[in-house]
Amino acid sequence: MGRRNDHSRDELRELCENAAGEIIQSEGLGGLTARKVASAIGYSPGTLYVAFQNLDEIILHVNGETLADLYECIRLIPGLKPDPLEAALALANAYLQYAVEHPNRWRSLFEHRLPPSMPLPDWFNALTTRMFAVVAEPLERIRPAMTPEESLVASRALWSSVHGVASLGLDSKLEIDDRANVHHVMQLLVVSYVRGLAAGEEIAT
């Protein structure tokens, strides 16, 4: 591993992000420290703050990479599933599969809390916005008359519900035996929601 004068600031940022991502993947967010990141890249802990404001900023960028990875897993699904219900089910299943395959990276998205003095940057909000746009696409096919505000609320409502099932299922808090049953609960949720949307149930905005 090179020393400080061997890497530019951008290169140092990339090294830190990659190392932090690997630590979170293997040990979870609770296992991440600045000292571990520094050790992994061969620098002193203080050098990290040449590239980042603090450890929270490093985590934010790792979580951004996770959102980008998840987006790549789902972005093509609506175009491959002409039936909007099938598309919604496939999106939910892809989300659950990602959580199963990358549990620590996935949990980090929701476990990490920024300090009050550090608002979410625009680039991170843009990553979440495009995720919800993918979810909204089949819902807008089901109910074309939705306003943009209704579409946003509908996609967030469905995705939040799917996340709840995934989270409780992976933590074994649903009192169900195996992953197949988690998929069954997920399917029941999505089908019920989509049918309600198709039936014209009111969307509060």
Question: For each of these PLM feature ranges, what is it?
Answer:
Residues 158-177, 192-203:
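Amphipathic C-terminal alpha-helical segment
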Residues 1-11, 81, 201-205:
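N-terminal intrinsically disordered/low-complexity leader segments
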Residues 30-36:
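Ser/Thr-centered, proline-biased regulatory motifs
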Residues 101-119, 136, 167-175:
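Amphipathic alpha-helical segments used for helix-helix packing
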Residues 118-144, 152-157, 184-195:
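Amphipathic alpha-helical packing segments from all-alpha helical-bundle domains
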Residues 10-18, 25, 30, 51-75, ...:
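An amphipathic alpha-helix adjacent to DNA-recognition modules
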Residues 41-52:
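Short hydrophobic/aromatic patch on the recognition helix
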Residues 75-104, 145-148, 154-158:
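Hydrophobic alpha-helical connector segments
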